[in-house]
């Protein structure tokens, strides 16, 4: 399975958003990772539909939307209509997770589930074969620029074994604190998609940083 890099738009310069979108378009990155936060499920508020619509208008790569919100079912069709290709919801935010996953797929998007750092992988056993992607939070969700949680390597490996055992075929995405210092170890543990925010957009040369990260993971 190809290893992918997904710059997180949460870390972009919102006064120069189109510039940063074009940078990602012209880089070696594979996806746009877009965090939607409601100030309820997580303490922070990021951005909503108008910003996503503007991003989708210019983005030329896969749009990977990560919902950190309560009751995500309310907006599934809206995100599909706005151009999201992948929609990931949090295990901790869904009352009827299987129904939510089926609704995402019915709307034409790939379906993902995110789990917080201290949520065990075992909660995914009954749903893993329905998923296209699992997003492991390697920081506590809600803010960019946090330090990487070391237990992520163990969880990634556990998830890899679950996917292999069930023949699910879904991707493993790591979100939070990803840099060139931990990228290879994450891929070796079983990850396929690395989300990088502050590491990319805080760099002097984001395009070069993406290229280096992409080259390092093959």
Predicted features, each with a name:
Residues 191-196, 201-202:
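Acidic, Mg2+-coordinating phosphoryl-transfer loop and its flanking beta/alpha structural elements
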Residues 177-189:
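Acidic, divalent-metal-coordinating active-site segment for phosphoryl/phosphodiester hydrolysis
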Residues 141-144:
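Short acidic, Gly/Pro-enriched loop/turn segments at secondary-structure junctions
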Residues 118-120, 179:
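Short acidic loop-to-helix transition motifs that present clustered carboxylates
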Residues 4, 114, 135-138, 173, ...:
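Conserved beta-strand segments that form the floor/walls of ligand-binding pockets within enzyme
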Residues 1-88, 92-96, 103-106, 111, ...:
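Conserved N-terminal beta1-alpha1 strand-loop-helix module at the mouth
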Residues 33, 173-174:
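Generic enzyme active-site microenvironment
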């Amino acid at each position: 399975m190809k290893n992918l890099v997904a710059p997180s738009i949460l870390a972009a310069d919102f006064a120069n958003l189109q510039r940063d979108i074009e940078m990602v378009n012209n880089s070696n990155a594979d996806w746009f990772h877009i965090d939607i936060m409601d100030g309820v499920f997580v303490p922070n508020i990021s951005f909503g539909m108008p910003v996503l619509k503007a991003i989708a208008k210019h983005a030329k790569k896969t749009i990977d939307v990560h919902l950190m919100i309560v009751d995500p079912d309310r907006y599934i069709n809206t995100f599909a209509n706005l151009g999201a290709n992948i929609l990931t919801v949090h295990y901790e935010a869904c009352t009827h997770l299987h129904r939510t996953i089926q609704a995402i797929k019915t709307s034409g998007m790939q379906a993902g589930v995110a789990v917080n750092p201290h949520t065990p992988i075992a909660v995914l056993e009954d749903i893993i074969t329905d998923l296209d992607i699992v997003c492991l939070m390697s920081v506590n969700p809600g803010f960019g620029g946090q330090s990487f949680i070391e237990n992520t390597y163990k969880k990634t490996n556990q998830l890899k074994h679950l996917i292999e055992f069930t023949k699910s075929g879904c991707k493993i995405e790591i979100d939070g604190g990803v840099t060139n210092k931990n990228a290879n170890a994450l891929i070796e543990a079983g990850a396929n998609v690395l989300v990088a925010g502050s590491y990319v957009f805080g760099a002097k040369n984001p395009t070069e940083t993406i290229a280096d990260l992409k080259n390092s993971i093959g």
